Amino acid sequence: SVLDAVRVNFNVVKTEDDEPNQFDLEVYNLSKSTRTKFETTDNRVILQAGYASMGLKLLAIGDIVRGSTEFKQPDVITSVDCRDGGRALRDARASLSFEPNVPAKTMVEELVKKLNVDNIEIGFDLSGTFKNGWSFYGSARDGLNKLGSCFGFQWSVQNNTLQLTKKRTPSAREAVLLTPSTGMIGSPSRIDKTGNNLTKAKEEPGLKVKCLLNPALVPGDPVVIESADYPRGTYRIVKVAHI
């Protein structure tokens, strides 16, 4: 079903790690049949949003984890909790065996077939082999993590597309430019180097930026940031929150 001209509140959080991205919706005054669809686990939700000047853009895709409806007169509010690739990452299992010297890319592609995502994007030259071959049985998610540890990549599911990048390296996509004239709100704030996440990942300090809604901002992609307080620089997006 396509919903238009309804009141919707959303909170979308995306990261570049292997945990499913999540988003929550509050949808107002739906018909009973439509409410039932939003209350059905594993149904797929596609969220589009945007300003009148740019039209609707894809913001998030997810499988319903839970849905419920609350009657608050005069409104009927349906709350929905979704996960991007949630069903695939939860359920997909693999039993695979590869001969010696099979390319890493081939092994990854075979694992991804078990996930039933829409696409796979490999943003770098994925190379390497196992000279003695490789066998795996278990969740497809665990298999990708094992290959990532061996061949130096990280992966995430973004809008039901599996995205691979070199560890701590942005994808090859064109960078989004964030400046006060392109939607930046206020000034960037520096992320403390001693933060637990940065220390664990051996990351350099980064920036936290607030801006107008921009669906083009995707974890793992490059972004160019420039403001009065910070000279132009290219950064890797590690987390995006659309609220």
Where are the predicted features?
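Amphipathic, non-transmembrane alpha-helical segments in extracytoplasmic/periplasmic proteins
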Residues: 19, 23-29, 41, 82, ...
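Surface-exposed cap/loop segments at beta↔alpha junctions
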Residues: 30-116
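Short beta-strand-centered interaction patches in the first periplasmic/extracellular domains
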Residues: 66, 75-87, 115-188
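Juxtamembrane "anchor/assembly" segments of surface/extracellular structural proteins
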Residues: 1-40, 83-87, 175-243
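Residues that flank catalytic or metal-binding motifs in active/ligand-binding sites
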Residues: 60, 160, 233
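Acidic, Ser/Thr- and Gly-enriched intrinsically disordered low-complexity segments
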Residues: 2-10, 62, 116-121, 158
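Short, compositionally biased
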Residues: 61-70, 168-170, 236-243
